[in-house]
UniProtKB/Swiss-Prot annotation:
This is Urocanate hydratase. It is an enzyme of class 4 (lyase). Binds 1 NAD(+) per subunit. The keyword Metal-binding does not apply. HAMAP family: HutU. The gene is hutU. PANTHER family: UROCANATE HYDRATASE.
Length: 555
């Protein structure tokens, strides 16, 4: 019997103000863990899989049940320790300490590879936490929409003089992360053709309004794109097909998209990427009998796809890696120039990171969408001179369907995160919001990740692989009083290629929460400015000076 599979489970987080735990500081992680497994949020909730191949919220259902049980009895001076999705200890700490500390998927570097991890996973000794799956702050595909939108806007500025009308993006993958591409692309004015091998994922994105149309042949999909571009109205199309097949076929036909990228689960060749010519059922069966054969076939198909991306780049397409490590996989299969197209962070996002700008997200624990709409208005009130941000919030309200508990994300920087969080806490205190909110972020942020093929690719000083920074980030957030803190390995790009940390804090309207919020949401983005200033980025150095950061070696 597989302790991780239970199709009878249907997890819905409680709404409203009635507590199941002893305080909001423990109610919040309980609700957010449950929300990660909401059927409208998780990719395979019956298997505890939230997104990203096998990114889980808990190691197995026994561990899930025990975590819930412990959170419901946890005191406000106790801390629960979670080791790769398993609750392993409760210790007396103090009221300002985190209520939960999480470590997921961490391996000693020599053994930090998929082969060793998969053996541990089979033995029930490990769990892949991805980024926000195992740290209980996944909010559905919205969580990456704005970052993807910002990237596509930057692509338009750099390559098309800011004009995206009549242009289209080719990509692959409509899972929890990849599903953001279609909506983000049309928000930025592009049409989008996204290849996906799992029809249920296309249907899910149609239902949640992330995809406009479904196609079952390349000709049909291209016709939809062409009609939309001629009409001047962008459209997103989910094409039921293997990305490697489609990318190579477009090269053969001489059809060149304006932009090419990919968000298949290439980071996990065993569980995340379907080899060319295979059905999903065949792949599932082969994983049980010939793991090495599956990995080899998947990576061979990735090599085909990356070679096609290189060919499309040569033909004039703006081509970028969107952080799934597909270039590395192709390189290992003999595509020697796989890294000739850039990753999205050094190409488009790093200047934002230098100012501590990143994915600030919050969730209404009440379950009431009105709480999110009120906080949207507060963001506009406190940041009045940012029309780009206001436009994002307006589009998000109009076009993004909430998944599970209502949530919002917006990219803001060092000077604004603590200010907004303190305002939200005050709104809870004075009754403007019907219940507390939690504030967190993706692990993809300015100071919380070391990932040489993604967030820290091509650092100015060559420090791409130095992972002291996310460790320091996690330690500082713990010392600052975050409600829960996590430290993971392998998110986004797979085993051996990243280390990263997460943070979540509760705004419950108390004065004590205000003090914690003020510390955490200043210090957390400040570590990103520190990290980039240390690497030599002038934007970060200037930001540090303007904000009065005490960086001894920058004097």
């Amino acid at each position: 019997m597989d302790k991780r599979h239970d199709p009878s489970r249907r997890i819905i987080a409680p709404h409203g103000t009635q507590l199941s735990c002893k305080s909001w500081l423990t109610e919040a992680p309980m609700r957010m863990l449950m929300n990660n497994l909401h059927p409208d949020v998780a990719e395979r909730p019956e298997d505890l899989v939230v997104y990203g191949g096998i990114g889980r919220a808990a190691r197995d259902w026994d561990c899930y049940d025990k975590i819930i049980e412990v959170l419901q009895r946890l005191e406000d001076d106790e801390t629960l320790l979670v080791q790769s999705g398993k609750p392993v200890g409760v210790f007396r700490t103090h009221a300002d300490a985190p209520r939960v500390l999480i470590a997921n998927s961490n391996l000693v570097p020599h053994w930090a590879n998929w082969e060793h991890f998969n053996e541990l996973d089979k033995l029930g000794l490990a769990m892949y936490g991805q980024m926000t799956a195992g740290s209980w702050i996944y909010i559905g595909t919205q969580g990456i929409v704005q970052g993807t939108y910002e990237t596509f806007v930057s692509v338009a500025k750099q390559h098309f003089e800011g004009i995206s009308k009549g242009k289209w993006i080719l990509t692959g993958g409509l899972g929890g992360m990849g599903g953001a591409q279609t909506l983000a692309g049309t928000m930025a004015g592009f049409s989008v053709l996204a290849c996906e091998v799992d029809e249920t994922r296309i249907d899910f994105r149609l239902r949640t309004r992330y995809v406009d149309k479904k196609a079952t042949s390349l000709d049909e999909a291209l016709a939809m794109i062409e009609a939309a571009n001629q009409a001047g109205k962008p459209v997103s199309v989910g094409l039921l097909a293997n990305a490697a097949d489609v990318f190579a076929e477009l090269v053969k036909r001489g059809v060149t998209p304006d932009v090419v990228t990919d968000q298949t689960s290439a980071h996990d060749p065993l569980n995340g990427y379907l080899p060319q010519g295979w059905t999903m059922a065949e792949a599932a069966a082969m994983r049980k009998t010939d793991e090495a054969g599956v990995v080899k076939a998947a990576k061979a198909s990735m090599a085909v796809q990356v070679q096609a991306m290189l060919n499309l780049q040569t033909a004039g397409a703006a081509t970028l890696d969107y952080g799934n490590n597909i270039r590395q996989m192709a390189f290992e299969m003999g595509v020697e120039n796989a890294f000739d197209f850039p990753g999205f962070v050094p190409a488009y996002i790093r200047p934002l990171f230098c100012e501590g700008i990143g994915p600030f997200r919050w969730v209404a624990l009440s379950g009431d969408p009105e709480d999110i709409y009120k906080t949207d208005a507060k963001v506009k009130e406190l940041i009045p001179d940012n029309p780009h941000l206001h436009n994002w919030l307006d589009m998000a309200r109009e076009r993004i369907a909430f998944q599970g508990l209502p949530a919002r994300i917006c990219w803001i920087g060092l000077k604004d995160r603590a200010r907004l969080a303190l305002a939200f806490n005050e709104m809870v205190k004075n009754g403007e919001l019907s219940a507390p909110v939690v504030i967190g972020r993706d692990h993809l942020d300015s100071g919380s990740v070391a990932s040489p093929n993604r967030e820290t690719e091509s650092m100015l000083d060559g420090s791409d692989a130095v992972s002291d920074w996310p460790l320091l980030n996690a330690l500082l957030n713990t010392a600052s009083g975050a409600t829960w803190v996590s430290l993971h390995h392998g998110g986004g790009v797979g085993m051996g290629f990243s280390q990263h940390s997460g943070v979540v804090i509760v705004c419950d309207g108390t004065d004590a929460a205000a003090k914690r919020v003020g510390r955490v949401l200043w210090n957390d983005p400040a570590t990103g400015v520190m990290r980039h200033a240390d690497a030599g980025y002038e934007i970060a150095k200037n930001c540090a000076k303007e904000q009065g950061l005490d960086l001894p070696m920058q004097d």
